[in-house]
């Protein structure tokens, strides 16, 4: 029997002899700051994830239903076709517009995330690279969410749904980057574990809040998800230790090729293709 040699993690501080107590951004957090990093990213994963799940699973399908005259807040409500006087076939009536909304959102998100990632890396402010994006993204998400909650047509709904993909990327992408930048290798497993727990709790909480909200009226889920979005970016910044200024970092010109490179699959990587195919099939089955 033989023991396989583990593949080295080329980004690990243990490999290149960097101090594992120092983060990538050069900071050495104190014990209190490590605790704030842990609970800050845990709270952020709940605050950012819960409203997003509530929108995707409950609020937006109900907005589609309301657009086509079906009020899910009224028990036993059946939409009547004014032309024939007969009940509308709800499932077949709503399946296609909901599918269009989902596809539009996926395509927009595919471009939004790498774009925001590149722009965030090049942000130079006294507040740091990630803080302005998280605060601004949360507030912008709240504003767009309130617009989506209005009784608007399917075309306008799709347009603002695209806007929300970019706004949510402004909130979520810098948060993910902050974990890799601000957490030293020594504490990364623990903080990432709590972040994962927060993601699961946020998903469960989002579904529950969406289901409870729609019991009152179809706008209620949009109102409290907007509040959560507005709070999420601000609360995360307040809980986490202050991000160091990026104003002194060298400026980098925006290069669109860096955005496009993130959309290209890695060459000569069959393992990636298999994992990508498996992930796609899994998500298609869940969806």
Predicted segments, located by residue:
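Cytoplasmic membrane-interface "Motif A"-like loop-to-helix N-cap segments
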Residues: 122-137
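Cytoplasmic helix-loop-helix junction between adjacent transmembrane helices
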Residues: 166-198
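Symmetry-related core transmembrane helices of the 12-TM Major Facilitator Superfamily/SLC fold
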Residues: 220-238
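Hydrophobic core of transmembrane alpha-helices in multi-pass small-molecule transporters
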Residues: 46-47, 144-145, 154-171
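Helix-loop boundary and gating motifs at the non-cytosolic
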Residues: 19-106, 273-278, 282-287
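C-terminal ends and interior cores of transmembrane alpha-helices
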Residues: 135-152
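Juxtamembrane intracellular "pre-TM" segments in multi-pass secondary transporters
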Residues: 9-35, 243-278
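Glycine-rich segments within core transmembrane alpha-helices of 12-TM secondary carriers
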Residues: 109, 189-214
């Amino acid at each position: 029997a033989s023991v396989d040699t583990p593949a080295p993690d080329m980004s690990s501080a243990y490999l290149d002899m960097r101090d594992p107590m120092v983060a990538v951004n050069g900071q050495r957090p104190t014990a209190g700051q490590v605790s704030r990093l842990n609970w800050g990213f845990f709270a952020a994963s709940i605050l950012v994830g819960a409203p997003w799940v509530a929108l995707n699973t409950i609020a937006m399908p109900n907005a589609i239903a309301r657009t086509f005259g079906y009020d899910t807040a009224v028990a036993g409500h059946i939409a009547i076709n004014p032309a024939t006087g007969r009940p509308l076939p709800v499932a077949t009536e709503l399946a296609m517009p909901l599918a269009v909304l989902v596809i539009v959102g996926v395509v927009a998100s595919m471009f939004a995330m790498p774009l925001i990632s590149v722009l965030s890396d090049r942000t130079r402010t006294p507040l740091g690279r990630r803080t302005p994006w998280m605060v601004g993204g949360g507030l912008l998400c709240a504003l767009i969410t309130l617009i989506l909650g209005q009784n608007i047509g399917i075309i306008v709904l799709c347009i603002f749904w695209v806007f929300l993909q970019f706004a949510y990327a402004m909130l979520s992408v810098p948060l993910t980057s902050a974990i890799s930048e601000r957490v030293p290798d020594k504490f990364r497993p623990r903080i990432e574990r709590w972040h994962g727990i927060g993601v699961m709790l946020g998903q469960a909480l989002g579904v529950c809040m969406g289901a409870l909200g729609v019991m009152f009226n179809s706008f209620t889920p949009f109102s409290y998800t907007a509040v959560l979005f507005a709070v999420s970016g601000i609360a995360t910044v307040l809980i986490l230790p202050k991000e160091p200024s990026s104003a002194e970092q060298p400026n980098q010109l925006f290069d669109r090729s860096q955005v496009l490179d993130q959309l290209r699959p890695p060459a000569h990587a069959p393992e990636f293709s298999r994992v990508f195919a498996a992930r796609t099939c899994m998500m298609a089955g869940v969806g």
